[in-house]
Amino acid sequence: MAHPSLFIDALQYNNWSEEIFKQINQGGLSAVHVTICYHEDFQEMVQNVIDWNRRFEDYSNLIFLGRTAADVRKAQKEGRTAIFFGYQNCSPIEDNIGLVEVCHQLGARFMQLTYNNQSLLGTGCYEENDPGIKIGRAHV
């Protein structure tokens, strides 16, 4: 059933299950930004996408992969929830700036450039020194 108001969970990590998907659906969430990567490399992130693709098949009546803002309205209209992939770290791009586009093609819509530690894209809050960026300008 469609909900009259638009609700979006801007960041979520969970032990995903049918029960959780039912709860977010019953709560009227039209979209959820789901963390699928913390410190995983590219191959590990791809496995997470594979796992999510299985969930999209198994629970297609409740969730689907969101890629655009229009998918949020689609989810609201259909009474489902659009799942948007996000990364808490840029580790899946490893040292290959071309993987940014590949990650986007796989569904990533959010990528935190830095958090705690130094990455190729910037310096994290735990670093004592700021050595500068390596490929950050090209990424941005």
Segments and roles (model prediction):
Residues M1-K134:
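N-terminal hydrophobic targeting/anchoring segments and the immediately downstream early-domain regions
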Residues A138-V140:
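Conserved small/polar residues in nucleotide/adenosyl-binding loops
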